[in-house]
Amino acid sequence: MPRVKRGNVARKRRKKILKLAKGFRGSHSKLFRTANQQVMKALRNAYRDRRKKKRDFRRLWIVRVNAAARLNGLSYSKLTHQLKKANIEINRKMLAELAVVDPQAFAQVVEVAKSA
C-alpha cells in the first residue's frame, strides 16, 4: 500500500485554524499551536454564551418590567399574576419594550391588569 504523507491535508487544516484566529492578538493569530488553543476556547465560549444570552435578556426584561410596574404601584410577580388572570398574553420582551418606549401604554396595561 502506498505511503500517505498528508502534506496538503495538514496544511489545509492549519490554514483553516489560522483563518479562524484572524484578529487575535500576537502569537494567538500567528502560531498554529497557540492559535488552535485560542480558537477552541473561543468556539467553546461562543457555544456557552449563545445559551447564556437567552437567560441574560430574560433577566433584563424582568428587571425593566419590574421597575416600570413598581412606578405603577405593583410588583413584577403581582403584575404577571394579574395579567394572567385578565387573559392578557404579552410576553416579557414586549412588556419591557412597552415600559421603555411607551410608558403611558404600559400604565394602561397595568390598569387593565389591576381591574381584573
Swiss-Prot record:
One of its GO terms (molecular function) is structural constituent of ribosome. Keywords: Ribonucleoprotein, Ribosomal protein, RNA-binding, rRNA-binding. InterPro entries: Ribosomal_bL20, RIBOSOMAL_L20_CS, Ribosomal_protein_bL20_C. GO terms for biological process: ribosomal large subunit assembly; translation. Pfam families: Ribosomal_L20 (PF00453). One of its GO terms (cellular component) is ribonucleoprotein complex. Binds directly to 23S ribosomal RNA and is necessary for the in vitro assembly process of the 50S ribosomal subunit. It is not involved in the protein synthesizing functions of that subunit. Belongs to the bacterial ribosomal protein bL20 family. PANTHER family: 39S RIBOSOMAL PROTEIN L20. This is Large ribosomal subunit protein bL20. It comes from Picosynechococcus sp. (strain ATCC 27264 / PCC 7002 / PR-6). The lineage of its organism: Bacteria, Bacillati, Cyanobacteriota, Cyanophyceae, Oscillatoriophycideae.
